Amino acid sequence: MSVQRPIRVLVVDDSPTMANMLTALLTEEPRIEVVGRAGDGNRAVQLARLLRPDVITMDLLLPGLDGPGAIAAIMSQSPARILVVSAVAEQRGVDLGFQAMSAGALELIGKPNVTNAEELRRWGKELAHSVCLMAEVPVISRRPRAATAPPPPTGARVDIFGVVASTGGPPALADVLSKLPRSLPVPLLIAQHITVGFTQGMVRWLSQVTPLPVSIAKDGERLEPGRVYFPLDGHDLLVDAAGLARLQPSQGGPCPSGDVMLTSLAAAFGRRSGGVVLTGMGEDGARGLLAIRRAGGVTFSQDEASSVVFGMPRAALDVKATDQGVPLASMPELILQSCTFAPFRGGRPEGGPTR
């Protein structure tokens, strides 16, 4: 897309007040032009086809055709980059958000729950920034055919895996977790960048697609094989030398931090740690994945063809944290093949590298 041309945005919200506010906040960014507004899902589908916007901001609780239904129709008829803007306080809205991600939405953002003008303006700048980033993402209406996966690494088997994801991550995680068996012999830790307020909804949604129990980790909890753990909203998830989960408030940057999580796995488990970086913008996860590789552990990153956004996997390749990209469809098998089938022991194995 030419840098001179404005980013054309379609705003979809059934509340005229909210639509007016979103329009005003977005157009404070000189690069953005709001070209249309829709108050229901059917009108959104019509305007997406007529206007061909670069980005659509989509509410979910819409009259008639709801948000996920509208997104599915748009992605099949006139694909666009879709940014969900929904009320976090409403559980149905949160749950619909992950249905929207499955239908093709790229990102979830909670509606502002503020009355202070300065805080509202700050939220608006973050929204506009997200729209500008989304405008650079290639529109994907159909997943390309996966390439052949590399053979699994030989050597030490893995006792714990950490997975990092951002834009496009929830559907990718659902795809991977749905193919892992209940007998998975290791704990699986997830750092998915997401707006505060959506984590519990993501846990509920993923629990419906995988045989593995999915939960939010508690500080000091002993990690169990065959379970999936997410951090508490606004926190990073780490592992200590005894194999216990540790939560700490995020210190800025991507939240939760994939680098923080993966680095803790490398320190605690050494050559028996494993890390995966999936689709996403930016560079989070690359340093942590490199720490695992330097400790002798197993590392994978998603390939470009199956990534919604190749930024994070590319960063992992650039720092040589992994040798080549892996098709998303091959990731579950590689994770399984890398796991030890001995009992999970927790902590650094005997003979692992020193800190």
Swiss-Prot record:
Record text about domains: Contains a C-terminal catalytic domain, and an N-terminal region which modulates catalytic activity.
Gene Ontology CC: cytoplasm
Enzyme Commission number(s) from the entry: 3.1.1.61, 3.5.1.44
Keyword Hydrolase part of the UniProt annotation: yes
UniProt keyword Cytoplasm, yes or no: yes
GO molecular function term, any single one: protein-glutamate methylesterase activity
Residue pairs linked by disulfide bridges in the UniProt entry: none
Coiled coil, from the record: none
Organism field: Myxococcus xanthus (strain DK1622)
Localisation: Cytoplasm
Family recorded in the similarity comment: Belongs to the CheB family.
Role according to the record: Involved in chemotaxis. Part of a chemotaxis signal transduction system that modulates chemotaxis in response to various stimuli. Catalyzes the demethylation of specific methylglutamate residues introduced into the chemoreceptors (methyl-accepting chemotaxis proteins or MCP) by CheR. Also mediates the irreversible deamidation of specific glutamine residues to glutamic acid.
UniProt name for this protein: Protein-glutamate methylesterase/protein-glutamine glutaminase 3
Active site residues of this protein: 166, 193, 284
Domain Response regulatory, first and last residues per copy: 8-126
4-aspartylphosphate found at: 59
Signal peptide: none
